[in-house]
């Protein structure tokens, strides 16, 4: 949303700072995925932004999965949270048609296990606090820049997985490293 997340500021006593925003209800939705290659343990991040003031729907989620599917070679295990849109009919139909995709669901109500939720928190609380875009185009440009910056930080992407406490043992049986 265009209403900024306000963290901290300073002002003389009695002079409360006021942040002026032009479109307080404008918003952009984002879908994203962290990928980890089994051979080299290379971490990457893929994302897609919605149209202005709209949500993702089953077909747009499938388009995003197709994007990741085209970019990543070999079998894919998708760790998926249980948000309703991820269980939409177009999405489940896509999974049924593409056997190269293995879908594992996170337990219900467990956002702390989802490393992509750590991406959202990092960008919101560390990269965009107090940021007040003038319009949705400016917000879209800044979000895109932050996600491209994040792609260049595999160490940070790895830390998002490590923060969850999840182990990649079933995926990498010869390596007991916990992320």
Where are these regions (language model features)?
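RNase H-like polynucleotidyl transferase catalytic core
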Residues: 15-21, 99-118, 132
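C-terminal anion-handling pockets and recognition modules
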Residues: 117-179
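Generic structural signal for small/hydrophobic residues in well-ordered secondary structure
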Residues: 32-34, 65, 81, 114, ...
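Short, aromatic/basic amphipathic alpha-helical patches
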Residues: 88-98
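Extended, low-complexity cationic-aromatic segments
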Residues: 1-66, 168-179
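Charged DNA-binding/catalytic regions of mobile-element recombinases
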Residues: 27, 59-67, 104-106, 114-116, ...
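Short glycine-/polar-rich loops that comprise or flank the Walker A/P-loop
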Residues: 26-28, 74, 99-102
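Acidic/histidine-rich, metal-coordinating catalytic segments
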Residues: 65, 74-87, 109, 114
């Amino acid at each position: 949303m265009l209403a900024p997340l306000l963290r901290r500021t300073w002002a003389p006593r009695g002079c409360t700072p006021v942040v002026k925003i032009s479109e307080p209800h404008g918003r952009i939705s984002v879908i994203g995925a962290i990928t980890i290659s089994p051979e080299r343990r290379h971490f990457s991040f893929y994302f897609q932004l919605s149209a202005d003031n709209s949500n993702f729907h089953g077909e747009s989620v499938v388009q995003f999965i197709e994007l990741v599917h085209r970019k990543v070679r070999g079998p894919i295990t998708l760790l998926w949270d249980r948000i309703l849109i991820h269980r939409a009919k177009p999405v489940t139909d896509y999974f049924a048609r593409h056997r190269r995709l293995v879908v594992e669901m996170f337990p219900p109500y467990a956002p702390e296990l989802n490393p992509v939720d750590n991406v959202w928190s990092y960008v919101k609380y560390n990269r965009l606090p107090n940021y007040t875009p003038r319009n949705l185009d400016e917000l879209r440009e800044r979000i895109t820049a932050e996600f491209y910056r994040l792609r260049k930080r595999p160490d940070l992407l790895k830390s998002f997985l490590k923060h969850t406490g999840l182990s990649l043992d079933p995926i990498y049986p010869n390596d007991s490293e916990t992320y």
